[in-house]
Regions:
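A short, charge-rich alpha-helical start-of-domain segment used by transcription regulators
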Residues: 9-33
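Short, small-hydrophobic-rich alpha-helical interface motif
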Residues: 12, 31, 35, 45-56, ...
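Sigma70-family region 2
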Residues: 13-14, 40, 50-68, 86
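Amphipathic alpha-helical segment used for protein-protein interaction
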Residues: 14-17, 109-142, 147-149, 153-156, ...
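Residue-level preference for hydrophobic side chains embedded in well-ordered alpha helices
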Residues: 23, 27, 31, 52, ...
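Short amphipathic helical patch at the helix-1/turn junction of helix-turn-helix
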Residues: 24-25, 36, 144-146, 170
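DNA-recognition helix of helix-turn-helix
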Residues: 67, 81, 126, 137, ...
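Arg/Lys-rich amphipathic alpha helix in sigma70-family domain 2
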Residues: 74-96, 119
Length: 186
């Protein structure tokens, strides 16, 4: 049986390496799922996961995240995006299309997408936008643009065709664009 988050955090605060083992046991699957989807390469995902657990070790303490899974996945996503930027710079090719690239048309210019996404105001506004969506649409948006799930995975999960998923994602991006324009972000 997996440990409770509070027990895992106590291990981190005691500087016990068991904290990493317990975190991997409880949340390693979710972390790897996100990294595999983002990096599209098993070896890169495994290497990045090591960086994620090191970052987790280095930030707890002083952080005491609740819930631990959200904190872990935020670190994983940030590490994965850094790794993807590094790998694409090394390869000098476009690589796979990262779902965030689909959002570029909804946000500012392509050159400022990363800086804009880092802005707390924009982050809060996107969260407000998501709260206005029906549950299924919100799940679809988050799975695509946070977890980087493929259209095929989502179609299987929702029981919809891939074209329906693509169409709904397009409409969601258009709604986000309209929302951000109305709120003065674009």
């Amino acid at each position: 049986m997996a440990m409770e988050d509070s027990q895992i955090l106590e291990l981190f605060y005691a500087r016990s390496e068991e904290a990493i083992r317990q975190t991997k046991e409880k949340y390693g699957g979710a972390c790897m799922h996100l990294l595999r989807n983002l990096l599209q390469n098993e070896l890169d995902a495994e290497e990045c996961a090591s960086d994620v657990y090191l970052a987790l070790w280095n930030t707890i303490p002083p952080e005491k995240p609740e819930p631990l899974l959200t904190y872990l996945l935020k670190i994983a996503r940030n590490q994965g995006l850094r790794r993807l930027t590094y790998l694409n710079a090394q390869r000098r090719d476009s690589g796979p299309v990262v779902p965030l690239e689909e959002l570029e048309s909804c946000l500012a210019s392509a050159e400022t997408v990363e800086q804009t996404l880092e802005g707390k105001l924009l982050e809060q506004e996107i969260a407000r936008f998501l709260q206005t969506l029906p549950k299924k649409d919100r799940q679809l948006f988050v799975r695509r643009y946070w977890f980087c799930d493929s259209v095929k995975e989502m179609a299987e999960s929702f029981g919809w065709s891939e074209s329906k998923i693509k169409s709904k994602l397009l409409r969601l991006r258009n709604r986000l664009h309209d929302h951000l324009t109305r709120e003065g972000f674009l």
